[in-house]
């Protein structure tokens, strides 16, 4: 049965009274679990940004590359994270890099697609001026494309962060270890419904904070 709001609130107070306790690898406070999940998200998302943003620029800039890569993106983009995770486990032989790989491959596509669309929508007049001035490809990318593409790029980054946080919860449920996803699954095995409800709110709040942080960066 579902716990009452009062019982859930009492469980939350008790849970957050000591969020960083450590009684061994399989019994750590919710604070540690959130931090471990955020660390994996940071690594997977960071690698996705390092690959996805330059790739998006190249796809948007060169029509031939766009025609070559677009079908592959359309093929891979809809694949569920739960399908990518076994591939990661097979290749890396460990849960942590497999989870990071899953975040990488699932969160890269919004950045690639939005960056490419932004580059394609840069006014042709800007590029004509660049050709007249005989600007190098690097100067075109940094002085013309990047400022014009920035709104699209930031939208892609926001979508990717949301995807990364969504994926890590599912991945950790299957891989185990320390992380908010594993913590939820462990509480389910213990039939601790109060903690599961609390985790739902925690996952939502952390996702909201990540998005607000990116909005703050975008305004600057």
Predicted features and spans:
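Generic hydrophobic transmembrane alpha-helix motif, especially the helices
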Residues: 74-110, 117-118
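Periplasmic/extracellular loop-to-transmembrane helix junction in inner-membrane transport proteins
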Residues: 1-46
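Alpha-helical membrane-interface segments at transmembrane helix boundaries
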Residues: 31-43, 66, 73-76, 92-93, ...
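Hydrophobic alpha-helical transmembrane segments of polytopic membrane proteins
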Residues: 181-216
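Short cytoplasmic-facing helical segments at TM-TM junctions of multi-pass membrane proteins
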Residues: 110-156, 184
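Transmembrane-helix boundary motif in ABC transporter permease subunits
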Residues: 43-73
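Transmembrane alpha-helices
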Residues: 101, 105, 137-171, 194, ...
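Alpha-helical membrane-protein architecture signal
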Residues: 9, 27, 31, 35, ...
């Amino acid at each position: 049965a579902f716990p009452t709001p009062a019982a859930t609130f009492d469980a939350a107070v008790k849970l957050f009274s000591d969020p960083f306790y450590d009684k061994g690898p399989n019994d750590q406070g919710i604070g540690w679990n959130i931090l471990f999940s955020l660390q994996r998200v940071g690594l997977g998302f960071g690698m996705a940004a390092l690959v996805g943003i330059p790739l998006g620029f190249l796809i948007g800039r060169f029509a031939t590359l766009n025609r070559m890569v677009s079908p592959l993106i359309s093929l891979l983009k809809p694949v569920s994270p739960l399908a990518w995770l076994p591939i990661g486990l097979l290749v890396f032989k460990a849960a942590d890099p497999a989870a990071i790989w899953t975040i990488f491959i699932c969160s890269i596509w919004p950045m690639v697609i939005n960056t490419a669309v932004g580059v394609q929508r840069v006014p042709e007049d800007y590029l004509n001026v660049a050709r007249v001035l005989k600007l190098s490809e690097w100067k075109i990318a940094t002085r013309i494309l990047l400022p014009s593409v920035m709104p699209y790029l930031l939208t892609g980054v926001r979508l990717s962060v949301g995807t990364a946080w969504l994926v890590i919860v599912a991945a950790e449920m299957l891989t185990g270890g320390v992380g908010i996803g594993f913590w939820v699954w462990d509480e389910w095995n213990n039939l601790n419904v109060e903690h599961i409800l609390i985790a739902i709110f925690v996952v939502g709040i952390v996702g909201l904070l990540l998005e607000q942080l990116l909005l703050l960066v975008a305004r600057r």
